[in-house]
Amino acid sequence: MTINASNIENSFSKINSHFSKLTDYIWPIKRNEISKFLFITLLMFCILFIQNLIRALKDSIVTTMIGAETISFLKFWGVMPSAFLITVMYVKLVNRMKAENIFYLIISIFLIFFALFAYVIFPNHEILHLRPVTVHNLTTSLPNLKWFILLLSKWSFSLFYIIAELWPNVVFALLFWQFVNNITTVEESKRFYPLFGLLSQTGIYLAGHFLENLSKINYYITDKFALQSSFHTLSIQIILTIVLILGIVSIKTFWLLNHKVLDKKHMSLLRFKTKNKSITIAKSFQMILSSRHIRLIATLLICYGIAINLVEGPWKAAATKIYKTPTEYAAFIGSYLSYTGVFTIFFVLLGSNIVRRIGWFTSAVITPSIVFITGILFFAFNNFEGFAGLIIANFILTDPALVAITIGAIQNVLSKSSKYTLFDSTKEMAYVPLEPEIKISGKAAADVIGTKLGKSGSAFLQSLIFIILPSSSYQSISICLMIIFILTCLTWIWATKELNKEYKNSIKFSQK
């Protein structure tokens, strides 16, 4: 039997070819792109780790120390005006400062506030807030305004919630993605964007695991250094100290990207200014209204915000019945975040292949489909809690209220994990083929205002009900919320289909 050398060579060639394809399938990053990719991933990791810590902390403070119903008031009456103000400031800064300096300025403002809250404001909140007797007298005499009175009486908690709510959309959605979109081509975005989350989204799991063990960390530090501060004050200081450290790391990483990693071609893109240096916020909104592409992206963000907020309100209200202190609630949120991190990694691996192999639309429509299906399950159980509780009690020896919280948690885990990967990636890909002027001003308004309009629109409806009917609860208005939820999800799916057409047309136009 003779061995043909050419056949052996062909066999090895085929093996190498298949191995190369497998490697590209799993890790599509080219060798000369590794440093750029990893530094962006590190920056994303730090920003998202901070985002998850302050998100859990703001909910823990407000829901347990003011009341879950106040969240809807804060989102509309506090977060919404702040989002508009930030948009005005950003558009003006774009025409006056380098993109790099804008990043440093805004990040520094956030970090300074978090430091003040941790070490000055919260330890002295009893002195800074109105006395409980005064608050009680005011709420008794003005029952329809009781939630506004509570928010103003505990102004520092309300302010922290507003600032923490702005972080995801100002720092992550606007500053981070604006930077990445300017240094990434359409071809790179198809390989980079889905995989950014593979390493950076582990921050969700680690943040959750950290919060789950917050009590143990608290006890260890108290015993080690013989501290006399209150348990909850120390917990908040621990969380915000980690936030400050990661904030400094993110600033340093951003500096390295600008001065050590990116080449001159990328740096010239970052110094981009709009052709009209005196562009106003009115012109920015006019640009959005005249661009169907941007309008559809804003519609996706609005629908996501409304849909998630309609489910989160009743879920958080139910959770406070079991988890009554900020530390307990933070541990609960930590557990939820840990599962979100695991599922996020799964969706990252799935999403990377879907975007590259199947296309933009399939990836983009998965998130609204998941939100719709799981949301319907939650509302179905919530609206028929008594009947469902009897059935579950016969098969599962547990508290029906805990089952309701678990179903809501599953809904949030699946919705958020798909949002962080598939939704965010496809949304950012939709910006890439647009002209630079629309990318900057259009993205600023669409991301910040579009996101907050979604959350605040739903929040306004809920707060209005609580003002008109002070005795109403999330349980009593659940069916009404479910109907709005269904209509919102159907609109979301329609907008995704239409944006797919615009995205394809924009790519064809940009390649001419």
UniProtKB/Swiss-Prot annotation:
Q: Which InterPro entries match?
A: ADP_ATP_car_bac_type
Q: Which UniProt keywords apply?
A: ATP-binding, Cell membrane, Membrane, Nucleotide-binding, Transmembrane, Transmembrane helix, Transport
Q: Name one GO cellular component term.
A: plasma membrane
Q: What is the annotated role of this protein in its UniProt record?
A: Provides the rickettsial cell with host ATP in exchange for rickettsial ADP. This is an obligate exchange system. This energy acquiring activity is an important component of rickettsial parasitism.
Provide the transmembrane region boundaries. Answer: 34-54, 71-91, 102-122, 157-177, 192-212, 231-251, 296-316, 330-350, 361-381, 390-410, 448-468, 476-496
Its main localization is membrane
Q: What is this protein called?
A: ADP,ATP carrier protein 4
Matches recorded under NCBIfam families: AAA
The primary gene name is tlcD
GO molecular function (one): ATP:ADP antiporter activity
Cross-referenced PANTHER family: ADP,ATP CARRIER PROTEIN 1, PTHR31187
Membrane topology classification: Multi-pass membrane protein
In which compartments does the protein localize? Cell membrane
> What family does this chain come from, according to its entry?
Belongs to the ADP/ATP translocase tlc family.
